[in-house]
Amino acid sequence: MMTILQRTLLSALVAAAAASAQTVNCVVAVVNGQIITLADVEVVAAFGLGDPPGAEAGTDPRHAALDTLIDQKIVLDVARETRAVSKADVAAARLDLARRLGDKEFGTKLARFGLRPQDLDPYLEGRLLFERALALRFSSTIPVSVTEVERHYRDIYVPEQTRAGGPVQPLDKVAETIEARIRGERRAAQTGSWVRDLRKSADIQIKKDCLK
């Protein structure tokens, strides 16, 4: 008799194979009993849904896509309170993606995988849920002192603008922008640290041969 995991695995493979006829499918990872297929990884990579900030140019985008999908699963496992995204939100995300890529490129990528636009909805929904879970957990205001803003202006903003040959605005004109940048960087660091801690306690099995 098939176990629940085996039945889930079989169903996911069949569904992914139907949606991506040109991809030789296999299981790339199992995260807390949830599978990630090669088709999942390649779709997320192709449509730019798994590009982390600071990803190095020239690296295989599938690795970033796999990391994104793993992070989504482990975060949503613990963020039980974030479980609903409206159809309207998903549809809006799909339209935004199509606009970002352009109609021609969007259509080409869909054809490559044998997908309809709405077949992207599960990936978009997962991304929206993930982003909302992080926003909910790290929603409190991160304090930034005046001294930090002044230091960033002196040590980072002015040198950056000088190297780029751009105008150097006075501090009072860019203080809010600098404060937001510092806060964003700090929130990203906190988020990254939390997700790394979740990974340590998660059951993650990666099948490296599948990505070769």
Task: Tell where the protein language model's regions lie, with residue ranges.
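Short, conserved catalytic-motif segment at the N-terminal edge
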Residues: 45-60
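Short N-terminal segments immediately surrounding and downstream of signal-peptide cleavage
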Residues: 23-42
